[in-house]
Amino acid sequence: MSTAFRWVEQARVGRARAGHLHTAHGVVPTPTFMPVGTVGTVKAMTMDSVRSTGAGIVLGNTYHLMLRPGAEKVRALGGLHRFMDWPGPILTDSGGFQVMSLGALRKLDQDGVTFNSHIDGSKHRLTPERSTDIQHALDATITMCFDECPALPAPPETIAQSMRLSMRWAARCREAFVPRAGYAQYGIIQGGTEPELRAESVRALTGIGFEGYAIGGLAVGEGQELMYATLDATVPLIPHDSPRYLMGVGTPDDLLGAVERGVDMFDCVMPTRAGRTARAYTERGTLNLRNARHADDTRPLSPHCDCLACTRHSRAYLHHLFRANEILGPMLLTWHNLAYYQRLMRGMRGAIVAGTLGAHAAGLRAEWAMEDWTPDEMPPPDLPPVP
């Protein structure tokens, strides 16, 4: 029997929700964090190692995959799931954010965007229909609408024009979308930090009708307080039985605040990028493994983590790997950071189901504000004598 795409609520605390996202490629507990696999790979990770962190869904990118290796090639090779060895759900970004970030390399009109590849300068064209067709060729479980992402800050009239163009494009994306059991298309809510424009965008998208709704155009320099205010004004307007996705967010603290405001899905390059630059997320904040203080530290990154970096290796070894520019360092820290993000999401889900999110959130924030574990709190392991 085919699976209908749907989000089913399990529990609620205030505006925070726990539930399950049912798709053609499996069921994903929410709230969930999606590791970013832009070009068909989560950087520095095998897909087995991504699975081992507890991730249930990953993200790919239309812009990058259309340029290399090409959507039709991916289709001919069995689709993105087979190509990258990920049988679970895949959400593909539409390419809009990347194209709009090209600056002088792109030209926007009412129909779409013409741009030059950042790889070889070749000319390409993306329209709502073309973006949707590419995502279909990739066999994305969740297809995103093609939208314009204006740089902030910008005058309200500029944001309004951009949002209304994105809404017209959303209608064209919906027309081009090929419905299939267990697959979905999400509309993207725009409007900057203007509550009235966000409300107008929600009305336009719900009038078209999508399986899910994303909140775009945030985490672009507006600051956490304004981001939260925008979520407070926007999230309650989204249909309660639809999944809600906050695009490109964020830090652990951002995730917690957004979950408290009713968001279900997230993606961000932070944990993987941090791992490649020697930064490790922990319950006590962020560690920089290049710092000399770790050079002789035999302890793991965190006493609470069961990733390979923490169960098999010391801070001293990880410090050495980065000082020696060994590729294993970024691999192990990326693994650790993704494991931390998934553990963070599991903890929030469990607290929502248990009805204890308030206390759980207070505990998370209190520990993030603390210093690194002392040797008394996390003693070094006993080392065998050197023969």
UniProtKB/Swiss-Prot annotation:
The keyword Manganese appears for this protein: no
GO function terms (MF aspect): metal ion binding; tRNA-guanosine(34) queuine transglycosylase activity
SUPFAM superfamilies: tRNA-guanine transglycosylase (SSF51713)
Listed EC numbers: 2.4.2.29
Catalytic reaction equation(s): 7-aminomethyl-7-carbaguanine + guanosine(34) in tRNA = 7-aminomethyl-7-carbaguanosine(34) in tRNA + guanine
Cofactor note: Binds 1 zinc ion per subunit.
Cellular component annotations (GO), alphabetically ordered: cytosol
Required co-factors: Zn(2+)
Pathway(s) it belongs to: tRNA modification; tRNA-queuosine biosynthesis
Region annotation (RNA binding) ranges: 248-254, 272-276
Active site: residue positions: 93, 267
Quaternary structure and interacting proteins, as annotated: Homodimer. Within each dimer, one monomer is responsible for RNA recognition and catalysis, while the other monomer binds to the replacement base PreQ1.
Main function: Catalyzes the base-exchange of a guanine (G) residue with the queuine precursor 7-aminomethyl-7-deazaguanine (PreQ1) at position 34 (anticodon wobble position) in tRNAs with GU(N) anticodons (tRNA-Asp, -Asn, -His and -Tyr). Catalysis occurs through a double-displacement mechanism. The nucleophile active site attacks the C1' of nucleotide 34 to detach the guanine base from the RNA, forming a covalent enzyme-RNA intermediate. The proton acceptor active site deprotonates the incoming PreQ1, allowing a nucleophilic attack on the C1' of the ribose to form the product.
Family: Belongs to the queuine tRNA-ribosyltransferase family.
Name of the molecule in the record: Queuine tRNA-ribosyltransferase
